[in-house]
Amino acid sequence: MIIIPARLKSSRFENKVLEDIFGLPMVVRCAKNANLVDECVVACDDESIMQTCQKFHIKAVLTSKHHNSGTERCLEAARILGLKNDERVLNLQGDEPFLEKEVILALLEATKNAPFMATCAKVIDEEQAKSPNLVKVVLDSQNNALYFSRSLIPFLRDFDAKRQTPLLGHIGIYGFHNKEILEELCTLKPCVLEDTEKLEQLRALYYQKKIAVKIVQSQSVGIDTQEDLENALKIFSPNLLER
């Protein structure tokens, strides 16, 4: 099951999930991409998102407005849907309308093999890495996440030295091995790291839970601001979304 948490009043760009992406609302684009891989449900926090999804025949459930993270909203949706404890759950974003089907499939495969949870990352350049909106991740020898940060990591101390490891940009999608894992993560007490960086995935690392990271090729960009949307609409074409 794929669940897309969708919040109307995003702090940096209100109503962004309803913004038009080549003739379809953003959240509908995201759901249509997800439905190419598995059954998808949008976890809404507002009736306007529900109505939009229903208009385009996208399955949706109404959840609380008071969740602290998309993961918590996913869990409520999973409970509403009555998912079995052993069912695999993917958490995709409602602001990634250009996410490729191949990336979702890669996440699904990684989740099958991950004992706790999985996510994806892509190689980025130094200029991209400077943006705090693009989260960076560093990995251990088994491609599990060591840390996620809005800062540039790993930091290259010797500026004239050649970088030995690629810079990896996190793609904010998650796979939980089963619903029980999702339940477990949400019962853990929030930690200071996730509050400092405003990155919910740091809770898992803080409590020594493994996050497997699949490195993928992707041109997708998250839409965090009005400027992001305007830039994305210049870069992408409608033809790329017709799959």
From Swiss-Prot:
Catalytic activity, as annotated: 3-deoxy-alpha-D-manno-oct-2-ulosonate + CTP = CMP-3-deoxy-beta-D-manno-octulosonate + diphosphate
HAMAP family associated with the record: KdsB
Compartment(s) where it occurs, according to its Swiss-Prot or TrEMBL record: Cytoplasm
Cited function: Activates KDO (a required 8-carbon sugar) for incorporation into bacterial lipopolysaccharide in Gram-negative bacteria.
GO biological process, one term: lipopolysaccharide biosynthetic process
EC number: 2.7.7.38
Keyword annotations from UniProtKB, A to Z: Cytoplasm, Lipopolysaccharide biosynthesis, Nucleotidyltransferase, Transferase
Superkingdom in the source lineage: Bacteria
InterPro entries linked to this entry: Cytidylyl_trans, KdsB, Nucleotide-diphossugar_trans
Residue spans crossing the bilayer: none
Signal peptide as annotated in the record: none
Protein's name in the database: 3-deoxy-manno-octulosonate cytidylyltransferase
Family: Belongs to the KdsB family.
